[in-house]
């Protein structure tokens, strides 16, 4: 464990040993990163179910539910993200392309959270709240579906249940319903101009990436296209 300094009086970075596959312990284990924010052993516990990499180490990290209800908080990094990637922890030669992704399942992620819940319930006696945002909201829903007795209340912030890798519902919604017709026209014109002026704008885009130490696993042109095409969704 590692003690961290920030908004909370007591904050710790922990690694919880988890089965790679909760239905087949013989496959071995990996270490899952967990950030514990301690207030008091009798206060409620907020379990933040991340959908991706943990952000809890940031010195200003907080959560509005934790503030509203004066809770302790556990932020759990999702398996296969950040420092919580099975197999890679033991073999530095493994890449995203060669990694075995078979155990990245809703059941396993829910079982990870269940195990963490059971461990910390031995210490904290208050009520438990589960929450997450976006894919973290999905994680909250999956977790409380598989283990409803773990949690007293779940509050997912946005919980998109996608039909597949390409859902198909977002594009017509953004094109026809989101915002006002004037808003949609302004955003469309903005996108067209950025694509037309790619050669002039791209150097500024590259400079911004370098200044913020941003690196990408795909070509810069593809990153540029993603930023332009997804701007209405982010807006």
Residue ranges, per PLM feature:
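Alpha/beta-hydrolase active-site loop signature
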Residues: 53, 79-82, 161
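Conserved alpha/beta-hydrolase
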Residues: 66-88
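Alpha/beta-hydrolase active-site loop
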Residues: 100-123
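Short, surface-exposed basic-aromatic patches at helix termini and helix-loop junctions that form
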Residues: 10, 63-69, 122, 143-152
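Alpha/beta-hydrolase
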Residues: 133, 142-235
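Alpha/beta-hydrolase fold nucleophile elbow
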Residues: 124-134
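Short, solvent-exposed loop/turn and secondary-structure capping segments
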Residues: 27, 57-62, 84-88, 97, ...
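Catalytic-loop region of hydrolases
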Residues: 1-72
């Amino acid at each position: 464990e590692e003690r961290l300094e920030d908004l909370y009086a007591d904050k710790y970075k922990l690694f919880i040993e988890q089965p790679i596959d909760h239905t087949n312990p013989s496959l071995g284990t990996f270490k899952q990163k967990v950030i514990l924010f301690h207030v008091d052993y009798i206060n409620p516990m907020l379990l933040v179910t991340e959908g991706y990499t943990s952000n809890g180490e940031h010195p200003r990290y907080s959560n509005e539910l934790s503030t509203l209800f004066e809770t302790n908080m556990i932020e759990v990094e999702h398996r296969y993200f950040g420092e919580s990637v099975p197999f890679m922890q033991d073999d530095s030669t493994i890449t995203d392309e060669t990694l075995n992704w078979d155990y990245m399942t809703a059941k396993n992620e829910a079982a990870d959270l269940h195990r963490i819940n059971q461990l910390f319930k031995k210490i904290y006696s208050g009520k438990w709240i589960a929450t997450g945002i976006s894919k973290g909201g999905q994680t909250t829903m999956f977790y409380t579906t598989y283990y409803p007795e773990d949690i007293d209340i779940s509050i997912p912030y946005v919980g998109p249940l996608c039909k597949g890798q390409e859902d198909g519902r977002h594009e017509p919604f953004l094109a026809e319903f989101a915002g006002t017709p004037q808003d949609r026209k302004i955003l469309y014109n903005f996108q067209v101009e950025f694509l037309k002026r790619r050669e002039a704008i791209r150097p500024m885009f590259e400079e911004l990436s370098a200044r913020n130490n941003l690196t990408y696993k795909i070509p810069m042109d593809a990153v540029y296209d993603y930023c332009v095409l997804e701007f209405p969704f982010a807006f």
